[in-house]
Amino acid sequence: MNKSKYELNERISAILINPYLSIDEFNINCNLIKKYNIKNISTTLNYISDVKKSLGNHKVKINTLISFPLGDLPSIVIDQMIDYSIDQGANGIEYLPKFFYLSKNEEEKFANDIEIISKKKLPLTLIFNQNRMR
């Protein structure tokens, strides 16, 4: 296999979040991740250990999606989800902030939530929907 052929794939993130995946579909996705040398995966808490097991020695960063897609979880639940992600061996957090705070002009609460999460042990990526930000 020509390594340069898949060089761009190392910058692409695979997303495994479908709650209706069969185990066969899940394994097909993981095999494609290995085949195309995908290096980043965004997934749910439920899939972290299965992704790690299925990918074996394939070097990949597994990021957990928190508060996605609605951005409406209570802070205590978010904190527990992040702790669980850490325990399961996730490499990062992808977080959808509570934009509702901004609509109520509560920028400080919005920023405080993000600050608390950013102090955890994992790198943090914020998810923004550009179309909703206009």
Which residue stretches match the model-derived regions?
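Hydrophobic faces of well-ordered beta-strands that scaffold small-molecule active sites
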Residues: 8-17, 39-43, 60-68, 91-95, ...
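Conserved, mostly hydrophobic/aromatic
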Residues: 13, 51, 85
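Active-site-adjacent beta->alpha loops and helix N-cap segments on the catalytic face
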Residues: 43-61, 72-79, 100-118, 132-134
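Electropositive, surface-exposed helix/loop patches at the edges of structured domains
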Residues: 5, 102, 124-134
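Alpha/beta catalytic cores of nucleotide-metabolism and tRNA/nucleoside-modifying enzymes
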Residues: 1-27
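Non-catalytic positions within long, well-ordered alpha-helices that form the structural scaffold/packing
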Residues: 34, 86-89
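Conserved alpha/beta-domain cores
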Residues: 18-28, 33-54, 60, 64-66, ...
